[in-house]
Regions:
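PLP-dependent amino-acid enzyme catalytic core
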Residues: 1-346
């Protein structure tokens, strides 16, 4: 592929300003404008100028995923809506998609890894999804689930929706960044120097990054990944989307994509990002315990990973205005209790 064709392909993978505006306008009527909570005592402890948590954990279905799912469903034709949709998901998109689908009067079938958290499967079913479980063995859990979703789409003539590698998903997720900027502007508060955001397949962080690149270009969005699943970091470092070998496990079940999506990577590589960082499970458990201790905020591990990254890099952030994207809260209560007990310093 020559350079001109490559640039044209990348443009098709990056949401336009016009589409982001349409998505933001549409979502105002259906999405929750989630709280932006200031944590001055932790800011003082870390010697930051300010610290806010954007609680996407309080979005419909308990994570940011509803934003992209709804806007993607809005793009379906009437014929596609009649036939229904299918997608693979490790859990959070599995819950968001049936709710988004119901808004437009269609049905959702979800393929999930058999080891996805039970609460995510049960909640997906309670929201109206028809859930199919897959065993993955030594293969990547999302690879196997994606293959099954493709087979179902072909067999049942359903629209196949990708949970993160989709320009419309990214446009929907950009609304999170716009809400943050609007809230800070109303408060006459400085825009952030850094935004810490988890990176799995890249659907959330690419939307966040595109929103800030447009309205706060000096803000650096920092990708946060669990150890062994740093595909975004490796991809940005080498300049192309890179597939990892499965070599690790993590309590961050929503951040186990072995490769960033083409559309998210096109977005992230088109702007200047913050330096990607890696967190380990011990740091994530400590961040979960800290969020609960400070504000009784309940986060799933993936949602707490950005806070863990801030704690890890606190010395580098002194004097800065920081935003943490708390992306989700879908976790078994008994697992949450166990993790925060393990995360409390001895």
């Amino acid at each position: 592929m020559n350079k001109g064709n490559s640039l044209e392909k990348n443009r098709r993978l990056i949401p336009s300003n016009q589409e982001m505006d349409k998505a933001i306008y549409a979502l105002r009527d259906v999405a929750i404008e989630t709280p932006l909570v200031e944590i001055p005592e932790l800011a003082e402890r870390l010697q930051l100028n300010s610290l806010h948590l954007k609680l996407e954990s309080m979005q419909r279905t308990g994570s940011f995923k509803f934003r992209g799912a709804y806007w993607r469903c809005m793009q379906l034709s009437q014929k596609e809506r009649h036939r229904g949709v299918v997608a693979f998901s490790s859990g959070n998109f599995a819950q968001a998609l049936p709710v988004a689908a119901a808004f437009i009067g269609t049905s959702a079938k979800i393929v999930m890894p058999i080891d996805a958290p039970a609460i995510k499967r049960l909640r997906a079913e309670s929201f109206g999804a028809d859930v199919i479980l897959t065993k993955h063995g030594k293969k990547g859990r999302e690879v196997v689930a994606a293959q099954m979703a493709q087979k179902i789409a072909k067999k049942e003539n359903r629209a196949l929706l990708h949970p993160f590698d989709d320009v419309h998903m990214i446009a929907g997720n950009s609304s999170t960044a716009i809400e943050i900027i609007e809230t800070l502007n109303v408060k006459n508060h400085p825009l952030p120097h850094h935004v810490f955001c988890c990176a799995g397949g890249g659907g959330l962080i690419s939307g966040i990054a595109m929103g800030f690149a447009r309205y706060s270009p000096n803000t650096k969005v920092v990708p946060v990944e669990p150890e062994g699943f740093d595909s975004t970091r490796q991809s940005l470092n080498c300049g192309k989307a890179t597939t990892l070998k499965l070599s690790n496990n993590s309590i961050c079940d929503a951040l186990q994509a072995l490769r960033p999506g083409d559309a998210p990577f096109a977005c992230l590589s088109s702007i200047k990002m913050g330096i990607p960082t890696i967190v380990v499970d011990k740091q994530v458990r400590a961040a979960m315990a800290l969020a609960y201790d400070l504000r009784r905020i309940m986060l799933e591990p993936s949602g707490a990973a950005p806070l863990a990254a801030l704690i890890k890099h606190g010395d580098e952030m002194k004097g800065k205005d920081i935003i943490i994207i708390a992306s989700g809260a879908n976790i078994q209560p008994e697992d949450f209790v166990r993790y925060i007990k393990e995360g409390v310093p001895e």
